[in-house]
Every structure is written in structure tokens, then in C-alpha cells.
């Protein structure tokens, strides 16, 4: 029995001694395939997907949304004109920003979706933007809408979607490599499965969720700078999230288990960024700031 145990121990040791080198080789290969630095925050970003593929996938997703019979485009000029007006200003600000090269390459397109029950907007790599009319009551004004659109445009320009896909690929590959090492080591299968499950949860909570929150904060930060450069009062972003908090009844899910920062965290961060955003806004001619139309 002792001899068998020692043999298993030696096999496990050899497997795990190879494991770190296996992981190191995989991580090195994946990481060196592509990376970039965020021009605003200096944050290093893993990018394993070419931009052309992101744009192609986004174009297909945008076409699917537009062709969905449930997603009817608005035909009301009162809804379309303010969205197009704000989008034009935010896009021009993006073309002057540190993302100027990408922003000028995008083929921008804006669609207003008549869906009064959905508080949403999105921007995809390649410049495809959709705004749901359900966001109007919480945005309230064109400046509030600029805060929303600035945030979404930054997600596209910063390639947050591509980065998340890269992070998922890296996490899955790492877990697979660990699984192989556990299997080769002759470890107890039940314990191995439990360990892999725990590692999966750890990757989600410890790596992927914080990165998602970081993406949201990054989009809030750069988005408010774009809105200010477009001539919109950046303080509207604070009021926007205060209204979001009121609509949620003051309740927000645990930030630890959420892909988004809490409303309180967002408001606090936005207040801190006003020292940078307000001088930009004050140096620009003010943009029109009409109230958005009521839902009907």
C-alpha cells in the first residue's frame, strides 16, 4: 500500500511539475497573439480576435436586430431627430478623441427602435448604434442621452466585447490545461471534478466579473469625456444614474457577483471625474439640450 501510494505521489508530482510549464506555454502563446493598451487609462488589454472579425460579427448581429419583427424601427421624427442629433455630436467627438483612427474608420449607422418597455442602447464595433425609446424617460434630456450614447460608443471603440471573448478563451484554455494535468496525475476523479468546478467559479468571480466591471467603469469614464467634448453637460451622467437607482427601488445586486458596478459606485466615480470633464465641457460651445419626447 505504501509503495502504491508513493508511486501515485511520484506520478502526481511529475504531472504537476510539468503543469506550470504547460500553462506557461499556453498563456505565453495566447497573450502574445495580440494585445493593446487603452489610450485613456493605460490598461493592458488581451486581444486575440482580429478587429475585422469583430466588425463582421457585429454587422450580422445588427442586421439580425433590424430584421427581428419585434424590433420595429421608430418612424416618429420626434424620437428619431434628437437621437440622430446627439449621435452625430458624440461621433464627431469620438473622431477627435484618442480613438480617432478607429472612429474615423467605422461606418456609423444609427437606428431608433420603438420599444417603450426596454431601457437600452448599444453600439457595436464598426459603428452600428441602436437606441430603444424605453431609455427616454430615464435619460430625460439630450445631455442625458449623450451620457448613454457616449458610454456605449466607448464599449465599441475600446473593443470591450472582443476583450471579453479573449478573456473567456484564455480562462477556458487554462482550465482545460489544469484538467489535463489533474487527469495525467491520477488524482481522484471526484476531487478533480470538484476542484475544476471551484476553479471555474473562481475564474468567473475573481477574473471575468471584475473585468466586466472594469469595462463598465472605463466606458463611464471615457464616455463622459466624449459627451463633454460634444458640448453636453457631463453632470447629466450623475443625474442619469441617480434616476437609474430610483427606478431600481434603491436596490442593486451585490457588486461582487455582478458584471456592472453598483449605482452608488458609478455615481461616486462620475463625481470624481467631473474635475476632468467639466473643463472640457466649458471649453466647448454648448449643444442643444432639449427634453426627450414622452412615450406614447
Q: How would you label these PLM feature ranges?
A:
Residues 2-7, 13, 17-23, 27-296:
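A Zn2+-metalloprotease active-site environment signal
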Amino acid at each position: 500500500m505504501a509503495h502504491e501510494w508513493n508511486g501515485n505521489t511520484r506520478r502526481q508530482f511529475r504531472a504537476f511539475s510539468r503543469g506550470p510549464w504547460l500553462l506557461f506555454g499556453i498563456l505565453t502563446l495566447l497573450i502574445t497573439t495580440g494585445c493593446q493598451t487603452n489610450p485613456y487609462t493605460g490598461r493592458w488589454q488581451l486581444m486575440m480576435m482580429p478587429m475585422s472579425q469583430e466588425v463582421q460579427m457585429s454587422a450580422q448581429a445588427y442586421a439580425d436586430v433590424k430584421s427581428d419583427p419585434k424590433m420595429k424601427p421608430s418612424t416618429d421624427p420626434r424620437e428619431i431627430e434628437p437621437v440622430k442629433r446627439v449621435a452625430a455630436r458624440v461621433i464627431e467627438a469620438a473622431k477627435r478623441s484618442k480613438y480617432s483612427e478607429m472612429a474615423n474608420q467605422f461606418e456609423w449607422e444609427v437606428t431608433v427602435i420603438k420599444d417603450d418597455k426596454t431601457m437600452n442602447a448599444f453600439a457595436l464595433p464598426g459603428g452600428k448604434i441602436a437606441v430603444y425609446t424605453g431609455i427616454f424617460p430615464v435619460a430625460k434630456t439630450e445631455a442625458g442621452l449623450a451620457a448613454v450614447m457616449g458610454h456605449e460608443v466607448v464599449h465599441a471603440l475600446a473593443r470591450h466585447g472582443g476583450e471579453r471573448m479573449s478573456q473567456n478563451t484564455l480562462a477556458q484554455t487554462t482550465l482545460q490545461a489544469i484538467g489535463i494535468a489533474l487527469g495525467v496525475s491520477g488524482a481522484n476523479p471526484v476531487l478533480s471534478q470538484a476542484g475544476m468546478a471551484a476553479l471555474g467559479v473562481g475564474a468567473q468571480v475573481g477574473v471575468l466579473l471584475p473585468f466586466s466591471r472594469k469595462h463598465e467603469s472605463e466606458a463611464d469614464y471615457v464616455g463622459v469625456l466624449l459627451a463633454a467634448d460634444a458640448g453636453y453637460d457631463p453632470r447629466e451622467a450623475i443625474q442619469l444614474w441617480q434616476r437609474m437607482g430610483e427606478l431600481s427601488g434603491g436596490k442593486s445586486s451585490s457588486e461582487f457577483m455582478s458584471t456592472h458596478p453598483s449605482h452608488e459606485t458609478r455615481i461616486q466615480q462620475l463625481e470624481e471625474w467631473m474635475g476632468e470633464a467639466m473643463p472640457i465641457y466649458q471649453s466647448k460651445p454648448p449643444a442643444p439640450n432639449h427634453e426627450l419626447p414622452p412615450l406614447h
